[in-house]
């Protein structure tokens, strides 16, 4: 085993010894808090496990395995440190797992505020320092050349308070493809970590799944999902990772946006289907507005309540579907995330305090294309718009005074658009994919209550529905254009039906959304140049 140096803050620990022909490599030594863990020793050339990397400020790398053995695991990172990479296997063994990233440090405290005498105002306290970033996860080790799978990537460490979560480690090439590690979660005010990419497959293997994006802390943005990676000659790819959820706001603050979904991987070159795009994360909710102060006796109530937050988290966009192999189907686009609801208005005094508008839903992802004989992937559904926040309640009058007006309700958020033109059908035979439906518009917020004899507020307007995605064009020789769902929200126009090309019928136009006014129907797709019927209008 390598020499430990845990008490030397920046020391580098000794590496583990290695074996010649048959036998296990030694473990790497443990490094100090700011040092590097020792690398694991290599396993024997013919037979023998590799030694594990030592823990440290930066984890040591795992050693390489023998011909028939597994690579050593990477050491864990210290506080904020990077996890060590997993060791590679020889001929048959699996790669070692990557080390976990260290947790970021907490935020520093702000300076305490100073209070003066009653005739002067006190000074504000200082802001707290930013939290440390979480360490990145180590990469997974490479699988054995013939049979071994790649090691899993280490997950990113959590960010400290105010810190950003670490990115997930990427998967590595192997016969069967290892998955990416998930992104670390952000601390309060922190951004979620990005999910790691899935591992690439070998000749027959399946691509690794993209890592999920980390969830955000309060007011932070959700991390993006990692992309799925392509399959081998015959294998299917990994799907895109799901976007992280946006953080909720503190009182009166803004909610964070949801992370975007990762793109689906492409199918194997010959037979594989395209992977589905990951769904977008939901937006974070906004905070409630603060209450107004009461006026003095005998007068009108003076200061108004703070309005609800005008900035709420929008839903993340769905990831695009992957392209198919020569004979496979395109992957479906991911659904858009939901928009967050608007914040409630505070209790008003003389001036009304309105609720804030709901956020827009995320757009659906585009469907993946087929190549020769397959069906195009469907476009993703748009996310629903968030509901508008309710208006604030009118303030109660003090003796001899006048009550405050009630606040108006916030407008509902617009629904997300459906996936745009969805995937095209195969060049020779196959059907174009359906367009994604638009998301529902959010409901308007309710008016606040007034105790009188003052004004009641108005109800907020509902949000418009998202526009449905267009259907895909049909294949060059035979086949129909894709159908197009209409918008599911209020008043939006339906999408255009897909056009046929040489022989085939046009797709049906999407229905218009209901509302005031109602949305117009989408136009039907064109017929094929030689034979076919045009699509009906929505």
Specify the residue positions occupied by each region the protein language model found.
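Glycine-centric low-complexity repeats
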Residues: 1-538
């Amino acid at each position: 085993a390598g020499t430990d140096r845990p008490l030397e803050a920046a020391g580098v620990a000794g590496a583990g010894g290695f074996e010649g022909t048959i036998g296990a490599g030694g473990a790497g030594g443990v490094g100090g808090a700011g040092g590097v863990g020792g690398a694991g020793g290599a396993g024997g050339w013919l037979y023998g496990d590799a030694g594990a990397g030592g823990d440290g400020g930066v984890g040591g790398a795992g050693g390489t395995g023998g011909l028939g053995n597994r690579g050593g695991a990477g050491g864990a990172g210290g506080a904020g440190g990077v996890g060590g990479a997993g060791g590679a296997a020889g001929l048959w063994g699996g790669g070692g797992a990557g080390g976990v990233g260290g947790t970021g440090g907490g935020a520093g405290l702000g300076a305490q505020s100073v209070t003066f005498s009653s005739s002067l105002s006190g000074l504000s306290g200082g802001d707290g320092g930013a939290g440390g970033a979480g360490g990145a996860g180590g990469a997974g080790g490479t699988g054995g050349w013939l049979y071994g799978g790649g090691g899993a990537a280490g997950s990113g460490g959590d960010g400290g308070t105010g810190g950003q979560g670490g990115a997930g480690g990427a998967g590595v090439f192997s016969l069967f493809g290892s998955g990416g590690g998930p992104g670390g979660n952000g601390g309060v005010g922190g951004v979620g970590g990005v999910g790691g990419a899935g591992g690439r497959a070998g000749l027959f293997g399946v691509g690794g799944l993209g890592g999920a994006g980390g969830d955000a802390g309060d007011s932070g943005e959700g991390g993006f999902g990692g992309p799925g990676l392509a399959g081998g000659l015959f294998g299917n790819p990994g799907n895109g990772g799901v976007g992280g959820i946006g953080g909720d706001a503190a009182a009166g603050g803004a909610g964070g946006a949801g992370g975007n979904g990762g793109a689906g991987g492409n199918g194997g070159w010959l037979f594989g289907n395209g992977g589905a795009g990951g769904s977008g994360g939901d937006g974070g909710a906004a905070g409630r507005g603060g209450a107004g102060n009461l006026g003095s006796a005998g007068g009108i109530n003076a200061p108004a309540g703070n309005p609800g937050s005008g900035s709420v988290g929008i839903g993340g966009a769905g990831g695009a579907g992957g392209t198919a192999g020569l004979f496979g189907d395109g992957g479906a686009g991911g659904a858009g995330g939901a928009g967050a609801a608007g914040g409630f208005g505070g209790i008003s005094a003389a001036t009304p305090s309105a609720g804030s508008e709901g956020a827009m839903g995320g757009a659906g992802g585009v469907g993946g294309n087929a190549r020769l004989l397959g069906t195009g992937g469907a476009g993703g559904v748009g996310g629903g718009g968030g509901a508008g926040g309710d208006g604030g309640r009118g303030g109660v009058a003090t003796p001899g005074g006048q009550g405050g007006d009630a606040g108006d309700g916030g407008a509902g958020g617009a629904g997300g658009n459906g996936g745009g033109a969805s995937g095209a059908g195969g060049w020779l035979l196959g059907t174009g994919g359906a367009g994604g439906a638009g998301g529902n518009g959010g409901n308007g917020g309710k008016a606040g209550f007034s105790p009188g004899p003052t004004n009641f507020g108005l109800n907020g307007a509902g949000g418009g529905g998202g526009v449905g995605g267009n259907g895909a064009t049909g294949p060059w020789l035979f086949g129909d254009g894709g159908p197009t769902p209409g918008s599911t929200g209020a008043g939006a126009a339906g999408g255009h039906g897909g056009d046929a090309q040489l022989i085939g019928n046009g797709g049906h136009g999407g229905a218009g959304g209901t509302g005031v006014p109602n949305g117009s129907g989408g136009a039907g797709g064109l017929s094929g140049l030689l034979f076919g019927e045009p699509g009906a209008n929505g």
